[in-house]
């Protein structure tokens, strides 16, 4: 009898031991999970503060460029291509982009249209010519240009030949309405009629959405690879190839004035009316810049996009700051 009791006692002890081991393992797992969570939070906070430090550095670089020259050009410190810098337990990678080296879609909100208008507004022709230069079919390009204006103007009436308003978007699935205000980001352009994924990918390097309906293209910072935008401003006289050659021959520190730029031989054949119209939207300085940086601390990553604005060409102010973005997700095309 005692032998049987000893066997039962041993089984009970083994069961208790198994339960204790299981509880200990669970506690250890939870402790490790909490430790990892705390580590990730600390790393993310560190990356966040690093990103603000990068923003402050970019601000100084922009302000220094204003002090060093009367113009904004690609020879200045801010214009370095994407750089990577080491940090404690990580790194930062980023670049600054001149936001006046692209077509401001919100500038269309300032276009004045009247019922008896015969001639298409200049900015609409520029956007249409840009899209055509990017191999978008002519009719589709005109529809996109007109629809973009209708999408961001303040009324809900159709004033262009090929544009659409709320009634069109309400018929889609899911239904939505035209913004009737400025775009907050160029990615919102995807909601406009006929702006498909292929068109968006082609045009995105050439367009932007600034918080203003004003637009000036800085001819000193427009990359030669994006010469199609310059060609669109002088269409149909200036070809993309000639525009690219013109930008590749740009002085090291850029042109001193818009008149110096317009005096280039490549533009001598441009119609005077087109020249004068384009001149209104050309510049050799800039007021808007965007920092796009990614900070990596261990396995925690923070992406920051900061929009700087200067109204006095002395100090730069952050008027918009965003964290995260499109690059946070890498799409697996094989599953689509």
From Swiss-Prot:
Cleaved by prepilin peptidase. It is found in: Cell inner membrane. Its main location: membrane. It holds the Pfam family T2SSK. Keywords: Cell inner membrane, Cell membrane, Membrane, Protein transport, Transmembrane, Transmembrane helix, Transport. GO terms for biological process: protein secretion. Residues 29-336 are periplasmic. GO terms for cellular component: plasma membrane. Residues 1-7 form a propeptide. Type II secretion is composed of four main components: the outer membrane complex, the inner membrane complex, the cytoplasmic secretion ATPase and the periplasm-spanning pseudopilus. Interacts with core component EpsG. Component of the type II secretion system required for the energy-dependent secretion of extracellular factors such as proteases and toxins from the periplasm. Plays a role in pseudopilus assembly and seems to control its length. Interacts with the pseudopilus tip complex that is critical for the recognition and binding of secretion substrates. NCBIfam families: T2SS_GspK (NF037980). This is Type II secretion system protein K.
């Amino acid at each position: 009898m005692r032998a049987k009791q000893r066997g039962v006692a041993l089984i009970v002890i083994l069961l208790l031991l198994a339960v204790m081991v299981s509880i200990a393992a669970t506690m250890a797992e939870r402790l490790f999970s909490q430790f990892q969570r705390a580590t990730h939070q600390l790393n993310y906070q560190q990356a966040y503060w690093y990103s603000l430090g990068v923003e402050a550095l970019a601000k100084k670089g922009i302000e220094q460029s204003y002090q060093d020259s009367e113009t904004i050009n690609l020879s200045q410190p801010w214009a370095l291509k994407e750089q990577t810098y080491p940090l404690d337990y990580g790194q930062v990678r980023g670049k600054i982009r001149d936001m006046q080296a692209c077509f401001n879609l919100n500038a269309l909100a300032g276009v004045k249209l009247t019922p008896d208008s015969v001639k298409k507004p200049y900015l609409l022709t520029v956007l249409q010519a840009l899209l055509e230069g990017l191999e978008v079919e002519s009719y589709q390009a005109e529809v996109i240009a007109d629809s973009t204006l209708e999408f961001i103007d303040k009324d809900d009436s159709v004033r262009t030949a090929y544009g659409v308003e709320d009634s069109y978007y309400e018929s889609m699935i899911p239904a939505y309405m035209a913004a009737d205000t400025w775009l907050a980001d160029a990615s919102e352009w995807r909601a406009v009629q006929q702006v498909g994924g292929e068109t968006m990918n082609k045009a995105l390097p050439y367009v932007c959405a600034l918080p203003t309906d004003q637009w000036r293209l800085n001819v000193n910072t427009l990359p030669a690879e994006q010469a199609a935008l310059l060609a669109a401003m002088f269409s149909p006289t200036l070809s993309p190839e000639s525009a690219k050659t013109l930008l590749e021959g740009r002085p090291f520190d850029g042109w001193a004035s818009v008149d110096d730029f317009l005096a280039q031989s490549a533009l001598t054949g441009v119609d005077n009316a087109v020249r004068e119209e384009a001149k209104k939207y050309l510049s050799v300085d800039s007021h808007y810049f965007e920092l796009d940086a990614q900070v990596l601390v261990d396995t925690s990553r923070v992406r920051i996009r900061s929009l700087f604005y200067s109204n006095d060409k002395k100090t730069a102010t952050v008027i918009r700051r965003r964290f995260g973005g499109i690059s946070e997700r890498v799409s697996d095309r094989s599953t689509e």
